[in-house]
Amino acid sequence: MNKKSTFRLLALAGLLAAAPTTMSAQTTEPASASKVVYDFKGFDDVKLLKLFAKIVKDGRRYPTDAELRDAGLANEIEFVRSHVRKRNILSRADRLNQTTYEKRDLFMNIPAGAGRGTGGYPSKEFASDNFSMWNYTNLFGAWNHGLFQAPGAWADAAHKNGTDLLSGVKFFDTTGNPGGVGAEGWMPIITTQESDGTYTYAKPMIYLLQYLGLDGINYNWEASGYDDERVIGFHQALYKIADQENFKNFHIAIYTSESGLTGYTARALFGSGGTKTADLMLNYSGGDFTHQMPSSVSAAKAAMGTTEGLYAGVWIMNMNRRWTSLNTAKECGVCLWGEHAQSRFWSYNVGGDAFEAMSNYQKLLERGFSGGMRNPANRPAVSNYNNNWEETGGNLPLSSFAGLATWIPERTTIQGNLPFSTYFNMGAGSQYNYKGKRTAGPWYNMANQDIVPTYRWLVYDAGTETVSDKISPEFSYKDAYTGGSCLLLSGTDQAAGTDIVLYKTDLTGSTGAIKANVAIKSGKEGEKESNLYLIVHLKNGNVWKEYPVGKTTGKNWEEHQINLTDLASGTTIDKIGLRVKNSDANYQMMVGKLELTDGYTQAPAEVKDVTIQVKEETKTSLSVKASWSVNTTAATTGLVYNDDANIDHFEILLKDGADGRVSEVARTTQWAAYVGNIDLTHAQHNPYIGVRAVGKDLKSYSPVQWTQVTREDASRLPDLVTNPYTAPELDMDADGAKIAQKVRYVERFITVGGTTNIDYTANQPTGGTNYVDATTNGQVLTVEQGTTVTIKIKGYQARDEVDNNHDDLRWCFGRGWIDLNSDNRFEPKELSEGGEQLFTIGELRKGTLDQVTGLKAITFKIPDDARTGDTRMRIVFSDAWFKGALKPTGKFNKGFAIDFRVKITGTKPQRPIPADTHDQGVADQPEGLTTTGITAPVAAPSQLVMDAEALNFTNVEQAWIFATDGSLMATLNHPTSFKVASLAPGVYLVKMQNKNIIRTQKVTIR
């Protein structure tokens, strides 16, 4: 493709970034202190195919636990797998926009998460890509991952909404892009045949995908070879085997340099005579939709009798494209491409802080899909121009775009028997809440993203189909009932009644009375009318039923149970929504739960074989990676779907001591979970991690499987580095991170105008996270309220003759903040608007040379009402091509960050400290704890100490030694010592297991 960098294979940067054990045992931190959370080096596509080929030759379909361990896959495999069955979508015949072609599909050929390798995997990084427009998406490309390594959490989210997610991409490009590679290394693998002519790796690939629960493979094949007869034969063999396996949602997606499909190319790129070869993205022409859409539709029909799987590609670097041409070939699907490591929707999104960025991201997606008004029933006119990614002239990004809903019908999978439930979770949160109160810190997990609304947002005058703008719905991360987000309804003007139609459904009560549970929060003291109503539309009567949610009695979250007494079992509900009555511009209501349930009950299968990996352990915190299996009959494919075990989701629980109070700290639909930085307050805490399954009835629970996580000796653990503002850090999965570590840093920083001033110099790069906490170096800017201050800042100037590049801070935006109200965060608004943003320097997608050639002077005034006392100034630089990463917390892109100490003095009246509007106090214990839990035997911490001759083990039942390429070097049973003479010099990864606790440590053999 034009102007794009070459896709790189997964790197070992994450593995090698942490310091390995050397000869000095006294200074070695324990294995559990490792900050390397994931290790995907075993997920090499060819090695995986060869493993499954061996398994097939042995007459089996999937690997044993021992084979997974020996291949270096065991600790990560459940984070790659999806146990959520892809749900079927309802008929689109009654689609909202009847001018669309009912069967027209959308292929989002973009990254799954931001960054390669670990992008999209569960983490503690709240501000992360949580794509949510599955309600229009048929196929998702997972472009930032190699084959068979797309995150299972994303597959779970996709499958809940009826979307297929490819396992990753194979990249070939010989069109002239730097570093482009051909398919010469791949073709000999896939064209290998047995003596009977069958393809050696065809059945293994299908079995591998079925075992992972992922839906196919993705090709960028801008090189020769795709039309080789053996390659075509292999691809067609995959479809034939998938059909025999009833693997109906298997896909090969491919695009080449071709912008059109012809009778000549159809067999290689699409199929012929009813034999499928691939789903095809027609390459864009000059970045835009090809003019060959109509002829390609004709060629597809001639070859296969259908256009299903044919997509016209467009490069969304720019949204000023030939959208009007899409109506010339309505039977052709649409494919949005862009870009390699993070999607254009994510990279173009901006926000002053993490909350604003995450909220803006959902709104940007909504304008891109539902149209610039964020209402699919009220879309701007179709135009090929003025569809701007960035805010222009006060107009929000994509605010004039017609939206993909103009061409693509909406989709929904909500059908069958009750219950139905949503917490309006979008898969991320600044903290984890349970029933309104905090139980854990920042989190990101797409496997805890609820089924998304069918319509974003379909707002009408009550009881009509007249478009209304009197209520503005949005997802908010400022609060949550359970999880990390909620639905926020805000009034814009007076209205007698406004309907928000959320879900298209085909739901039926099967037994007993039908009830609804709705959690709401107004944030206002005292008893108040919520003016909120649950509305359900009955399929047979074509009528809306309305039920009052009731009053709020205070400012905190409240859950209301509503008896839907006039709905009998067997009644079919085909829409669910909310109605607001008598609203005005001051109306605001948060909705954190919407559940419809009946008397159906059925217990889930029990959880078993829980394994805990301890990560990032400090004296006062630790992170855990938990994985488990389920006590049910194994499927032929080796993959058990949750619904086969009557499981809706899993809950991760925490308690302090065997009899401690229990908290829910995470939910997931995967058979694995990561919980970061569990607060243990002091080294004497005795954490237990529990896992249980929740039934499809949403009220039955399996027994909790408890594991005591024995703490490492506190004297060997590092201190938890605390930063009340949270430390920003370089995104190591983003392109150019290593360059940033070498040449992107602030060399000089001077303040003028204070009672005391700062004069900071750096003589070398920072490296690591590229963040400097200079608040501890003794220098302080002391400044009185109302004083004008000048700062002078210079970035290091890189030179080609010295650094082999000039990729320094000139290519960045820079922005500064001061905490002026002592709330330990940085208000994103500018000083002139009452915020805490001091300045912004740099230009979008350009270099600004004076940021590195001399001291750049910036002047601002400390507000008269700034709070006095110690505070902090933060300056963050982020790449000028990714303005969305320019925020005071979280990860920045190819940049640098630094904090300085500030002391504000004065006697003028001070601005107040903002109140924390979250519910306060200790969270309730989870429901259903009456079921007796099961506690695994206590496992003492595994320890590894290295001397000149051996690796010495303590409390280790099994150990595995891996080279940096993922090769297994040794398997050890009950080891006490291992002679290192058998290992060549280099870095090795040692995984140690005691009972069901795993710790990992790196060692260097010299």
Annotated model-derived regions:
Residues 442, 498-534, 560-562, 594, ...:
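Extra-cytoplasmic beta-strand recognition segments
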Residues 97-292:
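Chitinase-like catalytic core of GlcNAc-active glycosidases
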Residues 714-913:
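A broad "non-catalytic interaction surface" signal
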Residues 469-499:
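Short carbohydrate-recognition loop motifs
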